[in-house]
């Protein structure tokens, strides 16, 4: 059974804090093994990449076969179910529409002294997209990463995807084509991350790497950060549902299980001011588990990491929700909009009973790449700005330099940086 906590209990604070800090992943000691792979690819390029692919993916390739050809992509698209491709196209269009509204504007202005200031936005030149292989290969995630990059103006989007025993998910290739991916390589793991960061004879390096992966991929992303940018280190998925007595218990149960079926380490939480609703939801979860194909995974998640938290009033739920800082926050209350305005920390908010989180996963248009493990306290979901850079612009004429220069010289000397002061003073004929 999931943990059940009541704010009326004397030990609530202690139990809630323990719940907040519980670990949902076993931290394996893989840093050294990952470092060896990354360093090997950085040093030996394609040779190391091909060796690792033989070892981990049981795939013996030559460098010339690393890249998935356009003909292979077209054949994969043709082999896909037409209705699914149509749904992916529909999702792509909505994701594009949403993210176009995020495009920032350049600005240039002149202040009271006549100094020209401003900034200019530009797209990152090349981005690498890591896509997991096997059962975790989700075509929707390809769209969520690739489409914002293309909207931002990224010229080269490079996808790497492992192909265990030579098998690639056709829908992943279809999504790559729909999303505007420029190049696709059949490699995965830490070795693929290293190839994107350092480059090989076959794979030209990129400037930023995005996309989820296993523990080795996450470790490799951490290790190459600084050489390239990265998006985030994603943890297990999570949903928090805040509901009152007006909510439908079956709908809540379905949404809790939709998160739980992702991964045994996923987390599903309900906060409610209704004990009746809490009881009904727990019963509904048990009933729905009996017909769920991924019931074993979902049950493990629900029983090990699920939670039902009872509060006296919905106002009591606000600080709890902000402390949890969930990846997904569903609000099923009589006035969901009003409650949402009190929330500071959430990756994405889903308002009302007719907005299941699954809509956001696929076709809502907003991005489903969101901060996990309470990182919504300080970070945001993936968007257009993750693929862009802002460059500041400053222009002074002689009059403006005379107005600003003396203060700059004073500060340069105060910091012991005499050459800074001199670079201004020479222009002002001051020593």
Regions found by a protein language model. Name each.
Residues 144-155, 177-179, 197-203, 221, ...:
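Alpha-helix C-terminal capping segments
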Residues 180-267:
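Conserved NAD(P)+-binding/catalytic subdomain of aldehyde/semialdehyde dehydrogenases
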Residues 232-304, 308:
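A conserved active-site cap/scaffold subdomain adjacent to cofactor or substrate pockets
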Residues 3-8, 183-188, 308-313:
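Short acidic-hydrophobic, aromatic-tinged amphipathic segments that line or gate anion-handling sites
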Residues 1-125:
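N-terminal Rossmann-like NAD(P)+-binding subdomain of aldehyde/semialdehyde dehydrogenases
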Residues 322-431:
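C-terminal core of ALDH-fold dehydrogenases
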């Amino acid at each position: 059974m999931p943990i059940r906590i009541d704010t009326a209990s004397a030990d609530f604070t202690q139990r809630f804090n323990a719940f907040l800090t519980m670990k949902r992943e076993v931290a394996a000691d893989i840093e050294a093994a990952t470092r060896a792979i990354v360093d090997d690819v950085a040093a030996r390029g394609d040779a190391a990449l091909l060796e690792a692919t033989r070892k981990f993916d049981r795939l013996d390739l030559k460098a010339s076969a690393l890249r998935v050809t356009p003909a292979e992509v077209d054949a994969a698209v043709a082999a896909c179910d037409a209705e699914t491709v149509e749904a992916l196209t529909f999702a792509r269009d909505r994701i594009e529409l949403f993210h176009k509204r995020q495009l920032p504007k350049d600005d240039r202005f002149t202040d009271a002294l006549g100094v020209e200031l401003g900034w200019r936005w530009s797209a990152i030149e090349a981005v690498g997209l890591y896509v997991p292989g096997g059962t975790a290969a989700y075509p929707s995630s390809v769209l969520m990463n690739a489409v914002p990059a293309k909207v931002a103006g990224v010229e080269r989007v490079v996808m790497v995807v492992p192909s265990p025993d030579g098998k690639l998910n056709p829908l992943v290739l279809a999504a790559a084509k729909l999303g505007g991916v420029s190049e696709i390589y059949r490699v995965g793991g830490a070795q693929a991350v290293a190839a994107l960061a350092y480059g090989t004879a076959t794979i030209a390096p990129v400037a930023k790497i995005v996309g989820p992966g296993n523990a080795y991929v996450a470790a490799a992303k951490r290790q190459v950060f600084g050489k390239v940018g990265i998006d985030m280190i994603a943890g297990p998925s999570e949903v928090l549902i805040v509901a009152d007595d007006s909510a439908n218990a079956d709908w809540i149960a379905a949404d809790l299980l939709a998160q739980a079926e992702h991964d045994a380490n996923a987390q599903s939480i309900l906060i409610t001011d209704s004990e009746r609703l809490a009881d009904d939801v727990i019963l509904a979860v048990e009933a729905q588990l009996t017909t769920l194909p991924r019931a074993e995974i979902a049950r493990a998640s629900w029983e090990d990491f699920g939670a039902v938290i009872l509060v006296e009033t919905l106002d009591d739920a606000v600080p709890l929700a902000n402390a949890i800082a969930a990846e997904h926050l569903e609000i099923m209350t009589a006035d969901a909009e009003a409650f949402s305005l009190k929330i500071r920390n959430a990756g994405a908010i889903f308002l009302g009973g007719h907005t299941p989180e699954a809509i956001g996963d696929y076709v809502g248009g907003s991005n489903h790449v969101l901060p996990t493990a309470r990182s919504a306290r300080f970070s945001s979901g993936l968007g257009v700005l993750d693929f862009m850079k802002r460059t500041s612009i400053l222009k002074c004429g002689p009059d403006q330099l005379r107005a600003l220069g003396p203060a700059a010289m004073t500060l340069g000397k105060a910091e012991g940086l005499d050459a800074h002061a001199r670079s201004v003073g020479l222009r002002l004929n001051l020593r």
